[in-house]
Structures are given as structure tokens and as C-alpha cells.
């Protein structure tokens, strides 16, 4: 996947965000009340409903151009939600010696596919000797018995879900609502 990033920074534009999660469960219930259910999903379907009530014409042009580059709902991209930050979390070494970044959502662990703004600590001492590749980190100075913790921002791999429409409210003030859905 080419590295495409949502063009509007959540900190630079006025916005609102609603996050919802869904699991597609097929179920059947007998007359006696016995229930059978199955779920084919491994990961939840997370949806972001974003509203930008006051975008400038320049920001709207960026967003429209980005929507066109993604061919509407076809191509996925990276989106960083305002709350997508991990603070001082222990990360674990895999069999290759790399450390997988993850987010813990109330005990449900999701691997992070892309992170930035990373700070790494080996045995509570900050180190600058590390590399990041997507959601994996290599920390050459960490021994297998070392405790590695990290702080990072993580991105969601998403696509647009539906059309993009812009409402002009005043000169150089536009309102836009966007729906994004996670993809794997």
C-alpha cells in the first residue's frame, strides 16, 4: 500500500469525532430459547464519523483532492484519531527480536500497523537507538531480559465509507462530514 495519510490534522482543524465498533454476529434461536451464534470476524469493524464544522476553502480543496486520489471508497489510507496515543506501555519482543506496538482497549489487544512520535525506554532509561518499521520496533540495545516500554501515536488503516459532500456556510467557511471504516 502506498503511504497515504488523511490530510487534515485533528489538532489544526475544528472537528468532532464519533467512534463506533461492530461485530457481525449470525444467530439463531430455537423455540425453547436455545441460542446458536457465530462470528466470522477476527477484529472489530471500527467506524469513525468525523465532522468538520468550519473548514477553510484551502482545507476543503485538500480533502477533495485526497478523496479523489483514494478513488472514493477504493483505496485505504492512514488516519490518526485525536485519542490514538499510547503512554508508557510495556511492549513485547517477538521471535524475530522485534517489538510489536499495540493498543490495549480494555483488555482487547490490537496490533498497531503504523506508529510515529515514538519514545522508547529500556529498563526505564530513554534510548534513541531504535528503528520503526510500520508497527514494529527494533531496539538493538535491548537484551532479551530487558523491560522495554514506549510512548507512541498510532494510526488506523481506513477507507472512506460513502460520498464526500461539502456545505458552504459563509465565505471561506465550509462544513464537511466524513465516515471512515477500518480495513485489514
Enumerate the predicted regions with their spans.
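Expand to "…catalyze enediolate/carbanion chemistry for C-C bond making/breaking, isomerization
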Residues: 137
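Extracellular/virion structural assembly segments
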Residues: 1-119, 125-127, 132-134, 142-184
Amino acid at each position: 500500500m502506498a503511504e497515504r495519510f488523511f490530510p487534515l490534522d485533528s489538532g489544526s482543524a475544528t472537528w468532532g469525532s464519533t467512534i463506533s465498533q461492530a461485530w457481525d454476529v449470525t444467530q439463531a434461536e430455537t423455540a425453547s430459547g436455545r441460542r446458536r451464534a457465530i462470528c466470522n470476524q477476527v477484529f472489530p469493524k471500527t467506524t469513525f464519523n468525523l465532522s468538520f464544522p468550519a473548514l477553510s476553502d484551502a482545507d476543503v480543496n485538500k480533502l477533495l483532492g485526497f478523496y479523489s486520489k483514494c478513488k472514493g471508497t477504493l483505496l485505504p489510507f492512514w488516519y490518526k484519531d485525536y485519542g490514538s496515543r499510547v503512554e508508557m506501555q510495556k511492549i513485547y519482543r517477538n521471535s524475530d527480536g522485534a517489538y510489536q506496538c499495540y493498543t490495549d482497549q480494555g483488555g482487547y489487544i490490537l496490533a498497531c500497523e503504523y506508529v510515529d512520535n515514538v519514545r522508547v525506554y529500556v529498563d526505564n532509561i530513554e534510548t534513541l537507538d531504535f528503528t520503526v518499521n510500520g508497527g514494529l520496533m527494533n531496539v538493538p540495545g535491548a537484551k532479551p531480559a530487558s523491560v522495554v516500554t514506549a510512548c507512541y501515536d498510532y494510526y488506523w488503516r481506513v477507507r472512506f465509507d460513502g460520498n464526500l459532500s461539502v456545505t458552504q456556510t459563509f465565505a471561506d467557511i465550509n462544513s464537511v462530514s466524513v465516515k471512515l471504516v477500518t480495513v485489514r
